[in-house]
UniProtKB/Swiss-Prot annotation:
Pathway(s) it belongs to: Cofactor biosynthesis; thiamine diphosphate biosynthesis
UniProt-recorded name of the protein: Thiazole synthase
Native source species: Allorhizobium ampelinum (strain ATCC BAA-846 / DSM 112012 / S4) (Agrobacterium vitis (strain S4))
Active site: 96 (schiff-base intermediate with dxp)
Record family assignment: Belongs to the ThiG family.
HAMAP family on file: ThiG
One GO location term (cellular component): cytoplasm
Subcellular location field: Cytoplasm
Length: 257
């Protein structure tokens, strides 16, 4: 089981809700992924007026837990205001905290991120911070009250997959008992399996599913890959070797002079 802020979950896949071809396809993707948490951008959906209301109704009908985010925010003040609005709309203290520092890479502004996390935690929020794999930043986020970290593995929407596996591995080693969710940059089910094999607890996806030729089928493929990667990690993966090692035993074989 995955436990996030005291909530036990069976699925290790968190699914974003943006950019799907239609609400019906989104709903089918959520169902086939078996996710229990979807992320929602309050800023985008409230701007949709009546369409936004229909979207919220769809999410409620799916029976999944909502993790609102502060996507598009560039300042502590902006993120805090968005988080408070999300709490009123969705009636949850959960917030995925995003504070973008660079427009081209969508890299998080980790300095403002720590400040915002502290402010929101003190206001009763349970913060899921979108961050980098930097260990020092991670320590500061824990000091600010976060009990989950969400490091990227590549820029948002890039589909490049994990770009710094040693850094991700170091993060897992540094925070062995903390829930770590890889967020951003996953493009293929194999990418998701790779980070789960490193010992990460879950993966958050959006573009890789929503922009697929068949989003619902891709959601199911990712769910299977995540389960496979996690299962492999628990089973104990064979470490790579520089030289060959015979897999066939030689005991009992005849010796020819």
């Amino acid at each position: 089981m995955l436990t996030l802020y005291g909530t036990e979950l069976s699925s290790r896949l968190l699914l974003g809700t943006a950019r799907y071809p239609s609400p019906a396809i989104l709903a089918e993707a959520v169902r086939r992924s078996k996710t229990e948490i979807v992320t929602v951008s309050l800023r985008r959906e409230t701007a949709g007026g009546k369409a936004g209301g229909a979207f919220f109704e769809l999410i409620r009908d799916l029976g999944v837990r909502v993790l609102p985010n502060t996507a598009g925010c560039h300042s502590v003040k902006e993120a805090a205001l968005t988080a408070k609005m999300a709490r009123e709309v969705f009636r949850t203290n959960w917030i995925k905290l995003e504070l973008i520092g660079h427009q081209d890479t969508l890299q998080p502004d980790v300095f403002q991120l720590v400040e915002a996390a502290r402010i929101l935690t003190e206001d009763g929020f349970e913060v899921f911070p979108y961050t980098t794999e930097d260990l020092v930043v991670g320590e500061h986020l824990l000091g600010a009250g976060c009990k989950v970290l969400m490091p990227w593995c590549a820029p948002i929407g890039s589909a490049m997959g994990p770009q710094n596996i040693p850094g991700l591995r170091a993060m897992r080693a540094e925070f062995p008992d903390l829930p770590l969710i890889v967020d951003a940059g996953i493009g293929r089910p194999s990418h998701a399996a790779t980070v789960m094999e490193l010992g990460f607890d879950a993966v958050l996806l959006n573009t890789a599913v929503a922009s697929a030729a068949d989003p619902a089928a891709m959601a199911e493929a990712f769910a299977n890959a995540i389960d496979a990667g996690h299962g492999g990690y628990l089973a104990g993966l064979l470490e790579p070797r520089d030289m060959a090692v015979p897999s066939t035993p030689v005991i009992g074989k005849g010796v020819f002079a």
